[in-house]
Amino acid sequence: MDIALKKKRLYGPDVHVIHREDRALAEKTYRRRPWLVRMAGRLLVRWETYIYSKLRDIPGIPELLTSPDPYTITTVFMGGHNLKKRLKTPDEAYFERLEALIKAIHDRGVIHLDMRNRRNYGMDDNGNPYIVDFASSVYLPLGGALKRMLCAIDWMGYLKVKAYLNPDLLSDTESKKTEMGNTLSLLWFFPRLLRFFRHLFQRILR
């Protein structure tokens, strides 16, 4: 039986666990959405597939698999739960491994840009971290001021999650960065842009 991983929305994908040949897979698909959302979803799937190809073989990144259609992206399901559910409080070892994972992602030139969302962080059955949902990511293989700024946004999002789930683990430096990140987030346009498009799709599809 398929298990939904995300609340269904008319303008968003279906995300659920499926089973194929005794293997649990995570499938994100727009195939059942209205035409306009389906076409936008096709572009998002193509982009996210490209990003996953840049992160191949990094522990904590789901393995990308062949998908049945251009509206769908399929990966290995990493198990466990996402941090939104708070089934288990992440400990210091978890966050240390998570920091190493984020650094590995950045070293490949990928910036996630939605690290404030606890649903994008996972904890597998062995307590190890993983990261999903790269649809809003950017790929900047070269260094420079823009990449440093966007990486800093990722780290601020990570610290916000850490502060929410286990604030006692924050160092003094991390606490100061968290406060600064909360202030700067008021100026960060990307979440507002996403909300704008969501409301736009809702109006169009009513």
Give each language-model segment a name.
Residues 41-97:
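Conserved structural core of kinase catalytic domains
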Residues 100-104:
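Conserved hydrophobic core/spine positions of the Hanks-type protein kinase catalytic domain
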Residues 17-18, 66, 76-77, 122-123:
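Conserved hydrophobic "DFG−1" position in protein kinase catalytic cores
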Residues 2-53:
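ATP-binding glycine-rich loop module of kinase domains
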